[in-house]
Amino acid sequence: MKNIIFMGPPGAGKGTQAKILCERLSIPQISTGDILREAVKNQTAMGIEAKRYMDAGDLVPDSVVIGIIKDRIREADCKNGFLLDGFPRTVEQAEALDTLLKNEGKSIDKAINLQVPDAELLKRLLGRAEIEGRADDNEVTIKNRLDNYNKKTLPLLDFYATRKKLSQVNGVGSLEEVTSLIQKELA
């Protein structure tokens, strides 16, 4: 079984690499944003609760997100593992996730962090903004997003490092080079 967490700053290539990895390992990619929207659409108990916060423009509390993740990992396609993308983002969320998984007889096998220098991230994100025509992705807002990410994520990296679950992977290189490095960490 492979229960994996994918971490990395905006522009590191998480989404692209997660998709490839999930196909190769035959495990589902669980994106918290996607499962929140799905739970709301399906009007599950947790989805109805999440909708109250989303409609008010508030962040969905960790307890609700954890409840939705709990429902998702109980689905049949997760029996051989899963890849969590975009969660946890804080140590508190990681602790709650560990408790949830322990209660389900599971645990995180590996937390993969894609490392990409800020200058490269800036280049990628500005390029992506140009292609997608996103006016909000200018140099100032991108640097702010990266600063926020770095402040919030460093304690999370320590959390998984102290548990001997963290693998730091160089996210600079060709698609195949980075994929190969990730697969070596999972072997």
Swiss-Prot record:
Belongs to the adenylate kinase family. SUPFAM superfamilies: P-loop containing nucleoside triphosphate hydrolases (SSF52540). InterPro entries: Adenyl_kin_sub (IPR006259), Adenylat/UMP-CMP_kin (IPR000850), Adenylat_kinase_CS (IPR033690), P-loop_NTPase (IPR027417). Monomer. Pathway: Purine metabolism; AMP biosynthesis via salvage pathway; AMP from ADP: step 1/1. Its EC number is 2.7.4.3. It comes from Leptospira interrogans serogroup Icterohaemorrhagiae serovar Lai (strain 56601). Keywords: ATP-binding, Cytoplasm, Kinase, Nucleotide biosynthesis, Nucleotide-binding, Transferase. This is Adenylate kinase.
